[in-house]
C-alpha cells in the first residue's frame, strides 16, 4: 500500500499456532537451541520493527503451510504457500526502515548452538542418495482486496476502525 507504515501490516497463518521463534545470538552468530523467543499463540502477528531487533523470526516448528502478509485496512498483500517446507523465517533490516519483509520458507536453518559443523547433523536437512533429486514448491499469490481474498480469520477480526483483535 502506498504511504503505509510497516506497522499497518500483519502476518496471518492458515492454522492456529502455539509455537515460538528461536532466539538468535548475534555474538555467537547462532540460533539458541534451548531458548524461546517470540511466542505465537493464535494465527496473527501484528508487525513492528522491534520484532526484528535480534535478527529473523525463525519458527523451527510450525503447523501452517501458508501465511499471508496483509494490510490491516485494505486487506491487500501477498499469500505465500510452502507445502514442502518444514520451517519458516521472517526478516527485515533493523534498525533501518527498509520497505520490505522477507518471507522465507526453510528446510534447515542457520547455525544452532550445539549442532556441530557437519551438514548431515543440521536440523531439517534431507539426505539424498547420489544422483537423486527432490522437488520443493512454494507459491506467492497477490491478495487483491478484503472481500476477494483476505483470509477469513482476518476478515472476522477486523474492527470498523481498521484495528485488529485476536479471534
What are these regions (language model features)?
Residues 65-67, 101, 136-138:
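Hydrophobic residues positioned within well-ordered beta-strands of beta-sheet architectures
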Residues 145-167:
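Terminal connector regions
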